[in-house]
């Protein structure tokens, strides 16, 4: 007989999932100013994405993603959170 409880997996603990963090308003403003763009010009991530949910991102937030790279050490990318 199968148990009705769901298995919960934390995707952030997987070795291939990079570090995700929601930027503060000040940090987001600074990054957008440095890049000379509007938030909507960043690549998007849906608020329903498992990692976005895990870090508590809401539509309008900007997520900083830090990936490890064998060639350049670390690569930082940003995503704009949209509804959905």
Curated annotation (Swiss-Prot):
<keyword id="KW-0548">Nucleotidyltransferase</keyword>
<dbReference type="GO" id="GO:0006362">
    <property type="term" value="P:transcription elongation by RNA polymerase I"/>
</dbReference>
<comment type="function">
    <text>DNA-dependent RNA polymerase (RNAP) catalyzes the transcription of DNA into RNA using the four ribonucleoside triphosphates as substrates.</text>
</comment>
<dbReference type="InterPro" id="IPR014381">
    <property type="entry name" value="Arch_Rpo5/euc_Rpb5"/>
</dbReference>
<dbReference type="InterPro" id="IPR000783">
    <property type="entry name" value="RNA_pol_subH/Rpb5_C"/>
</dbReference>
<comment type="subunit">
    <text>Part of the RNA polymerase complex.</text>
</comment>
<dbReference type="InterPro" id="IPR020608">
    <property type="entry name" value="RNA_pol_subH/Rpb5_CS"/>
</dbReference>
<dbReference type="GO" id="GO:0000428">
    <property type="term" value="C:DNA-directed RNA polymerase complex"/>
</dbReference>
<keyword id="KW-0808">Transferase</keyword>
<dbReference type="GO" id="GO:0042797">
    <property type="term" value="P:tRNA transcription by RNA polymerase III"/>
</dbReference>
<dbReference type="GO" id="GO:0005737">
    <property type="term" value="C:cytoplasm"/>
</dbReference>
<dbReference type="GO" id="GO:0003677">
    <property type="term" value="F:DNA binding"/>
</dbReference>
<dbReference type="InterPro" id="IPR035913">
    <property type="entry name" value="RPB5-like_sf"/>
</dbReference>
<dbReference type="Pfam" id="PF01191">
    <property type="entry name" value="RNA_pol_Rpb5_C"/>
</dbReference>
<dbReference type="GO" id="GO:0003899">
    <property type="term" value="F:DNA-directed RNA polymerase activity"/>
</dbReference>
<protein>
    <recommendedName>
        <fullName>DNA-directed RNA polymerase subunit Rpo5</fullName>
        <ecNumber>2.7.7.6</ecNumber>
    </recommendedName>
</protein>
<comment type="similarity">
    <text>Belongs to the archaeal Rpo5/eukaryotic RPB5 RNA polymerase subunit family.</text>
</comment>
<keyword id="KW-0963">Cytoplasm</keyword>
<keyword id="KW-0804">Transcription</keyword>
<dbReference type="GO" id="GO:0006366">
    <property type="term" value="P:transcription by RNA polymerase II"/>
</dbReference>
<keyword id="KW-0240">DNA-directed RNA polymerase</keyword>
